[in-house]
Every structure is written in C-alpha cells, then in structure tokens.
Amino acid sequence: MIGYFLYFQFVKSDEFINSPYNSLQDLFSKNVVRGEIQTKDGHVIARTKVSSDASETREYPDGRMFAHVAGFAVNGKAGLEKQENFSLLRSHEFFLDQIVNDISGKKNTGDNVVTTLDYEAQAAAYNALDDYEGAVIAIEPKTGKIAVMVSKPDYDPNTIASDWESVNGEGSTSLYNRATQGQYAPGSVFKIFTALEYYNENPSTYNDYSFDCDGSITKDGFTIHCAGNKSHGQEDLTKSFAKSCNSSFSNIGLLVDNNKLNTLCDDMLFNKNLPIAFDSKKSKFALDNNASSALTMQTTIGQGNTLVSPLHMCMIAGAICNDGNLMRPYLVDHTENASGALVEQNKPASYKQIMSKDQAAFLQNLMAAVVSDGTGAKLSNQSYEAFGKTGTAQVSDSTDQTNAWFVGYGKKDGYNDLTIAVIVEDSGAGSTYAVPVAKKVFDKYFNE
C-alpha cells in the first residue's frame, strides 16, 4: 500500500487524477479524506465531515454562494472540485504520520486548496444580484487573482445528488457558470473597442471628433436611436462615450475600417480560448468591409451578432487598468497540507501586452469620464476612484427585454486594484441595475 501511495503521490500527473472518468480515483479516495477548499481569508467553502462510523459527507458551509466556483464532488464533479481533484486527493501529511495511518487503517488527510477569492466581496456580489439571473466576476488586474465569481441561477451543492434531476433537467441552467461561460450581446460596453479603433486610425486628430446628436441617426434607410430617443447635443469623443450615445457611436462605426476593427477584436481575444484553467466559452465577433451600413451601425454599438462573456470583459478592463498588460486569471493561490504547511504556490503571470500604454491611457480617460460625467455617476465621490463603461443590451429584436452591463475597475491607495464585470439579465439600463451591483462590491472590497 505504501508503494501504491508513493506512486500516485509523486508519479501520476494532475490531468490523470483529475479526470472524472478515472476509476482509480475511487482507490485513491479510500486512502485520503478529501481536503478543504478555502477563500484567501481562511473561510472554508468545501470540507469533508467524517462521522463516528467513518462515513464521509462533503459539506459546503455557504451553500449556494460559492456553488459555481467550488462546484461539487459527485456526478462527474464540477468547479474547483473537478479542477483541483488531484490536489484535494493528495496528502502531504508528514511521511511518518502517513505510514502510521496506513498501518492503523486510518485515512490520511488531503491537502487544502486555498483560493484567491475574497469572502466579503463574494458575499457582496451574491447579495447584490438578489433574485436576478446574471453574473459578477472581479479580478485583481496586476496579478490576475480572481476575487469574485458569482453566477445565478444557482444550486445548493449540499443537496446536488438528490436534486440532480431538477438542476440538470431540460430547461434548467442552474449548473451553467454565467461568469465564464455566458455569452451575451455586449451592448454599449463594446464601445470600448469601437473607440479604441477610432483612436488607432486617428491618433493625432481623435480629439477633433464632433457630432451633433438629435436622438437618432439614419444611414441607407436604417435608423439607430439613442436610449429614450434622448438628444445629447454637441459631443466630442469623450462626451459620446460618457453619455453612451448610440447615434454618435453609430457614426464612428461608419467612419472606421471594419476589417481593421475585426483585427483589433482578434487581438483583444475575440474568437479565441481565454487563458484560464476554468471552463469558459469564446467571445464572438465578425465584421468586414462588405457589411451593410445597418449591420455596421448595430455591431459598433454592441448589438448585431457579437457575443461576449463577463470573464472576457473583466479581463479587458484589467488590461486597460494595467497599462495594456493582461495577466492570466487564476483561482488557486496555493495548496497546503492539513497542518498549513505550503505544498505549492501559484504566482502571477503575464499573458501578453494586448494594447500599448498610450492606448490604455486613452481608454482610462474615457472610462473616468463615464463616472465623473456620465452613466456611471453613482460611482463618483467615493473613497476609491472608479472607471467604467455601462451597457444596456437588447436581448432580441422581438422583445423589449434588456440585459444590464457594467465593466470597469476601482483604485484606492493601500489596496490592490480591482476590475469587475457585471451582467444583470432581463433588468434594464446598466446605469440603473449593473452599476449598483458593482458599487456594492467596490464598497466592500475597498472598505468604503
């Protein structure tokens, strides 16, 4: 048995053990009590209770709040229970203790997985979404550490086995992690990319941009309206962005080169797998110079056929905050044995420079104006400085339902910066529904 234990301890790979189809997991679990999953601040979000008769029950003390990120350890596993299965089933108890346990027939204690999650910020996000479906994800842009990952609707991982048919049945989306796998029309948060392309094509004259908004714009018989048909009057690029003027950005969309915008979006990780260990889906974008005026106008204000995930938009906000450098997002800070001794430490790693420092500074200024003079004003005058872009995305042409977006970041001396993406489904304007969610997370994270 000791030889078997050493073989799996030091030879077999993470991928081999983590596979939910690996029958040897059953043998492994007969010798190890599955370790804990913890937040960065020591809250246990998954643990194994061992009864007096030696039976084991996997418990999730916070229930639904960490459902999608912690996952579950039955029915094929999900979340961190799946991703970190090898670590949780591996024991780094002191070697002599393992030998004594083996001789006495006692199980060893598995290693603990300590995440990057911030317990209080996670709770703030979960409660702020209330009964709405949607997602919140927040990341430290200078490290890539994921501080918050919330998705609704959710499920109770404590009763997942008995609830399996209902949560996994036809029509149910409770198991779906909207934060990483959700694909949504971006609405006006896409104006980040449209504005950047205009800047790229007009590096010395973008400040000269001017548009007189009367509430709508028509081209080739197709009309785009501003929200509520509101007239924004004379605007430069900054005001157009801050007020989220659809008419002005449709005009900008007609001015930029669609092929170049398509290349920009490819550089910004559209149509690509995101660099994260968690299951995620690609964002989708396609537009070229053969597109009609109608499709161009729709696409450059975030409608059309474009789809994005909250994770992707949070990463883009992170690169903007971090002067163009995108860090790899990650959820596990380190693993430790049952006594708290370090086993393995994960470290921040840069993915790539996806925009120049000057490009990032341009977008930083636009996102600051959204808070100081635009649709993100509820985030102004705080102890922290906030930057962002709101969005209100039409769900389909046949309904008035809209999803609310906020994408941005916060900064405060003495704290790590925090980027955030919020999507509130079937709600209303981003300024009304998504910004307050972001504010509650920022308030808690920055101790407002």
Describe these PLM feature segments.
Residues D41, N101, K142-S188, F193-S427:
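Beta-lactam-recognizing serine transpeptidase/beta-lactamase-like catalytic domain environment
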Residues M1-W164, S174, Q183, Y209, ...:
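Periplasmic/cell-envelope proteins involved in peptidoglycan metabolism and beta-lactam response
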